[in-house]
Amino acid sequence: MAHKKGQGSVKNGRDSRSKRLGVKKFGGQEVIAGNIIIRQRGTKWHPGKGVGMGRDYTIFSLVDGRVFFDREGRRVNVAPEGSEAAN
């Protein structure tokens, strides 16, 4: 019986879409309440003053102001526009 053997399937050749993680607003940039500052997996950065954290570890602004990063404690803060910390 002259049958053609079926082609085997390929097990590789897939990839997931990128998740677009990272810093969205950098130090010194102005933000309004609700703006996403960082998208991350886990707590690479921690929320500081004027900042909240979502259940997927997204860091977002709670107040209008200016973003600044504290590298020592790896914290992200938002200083309200009229405060001294913003300068």
UniProtKB/Swiss-Prot annotation:
InterPro entries according to UniProt: Ribosomal_bL27, Ribosomal_bL27_CS
Any one Pfam family match given in the protein's UniProt record, by short name: Ribosomal_L27
Disulphide bridges: none
Gene Ontology CC terms, in alphabetical order: cytosolic large ribosomal subunit
Source organism per UniProt: Akkermansia muciniphila (strain ATCC BAA-835 / DSM 22959 / JCM 33894 / BCRC 81048 / CCUG 64013 / CIP 107961 / Muc)
Cited PANTHER family: LARGE RIBOSOMAL SUBUNIT PROTEIN BL27M (PTHR15893:SF0), RIBOSOMAL PROTEIN L27 (PTHR15893)
Chain segments carrying region Disordered: 1-22
Protein name stated in the entry: Large ribosomal subunit protein bL27
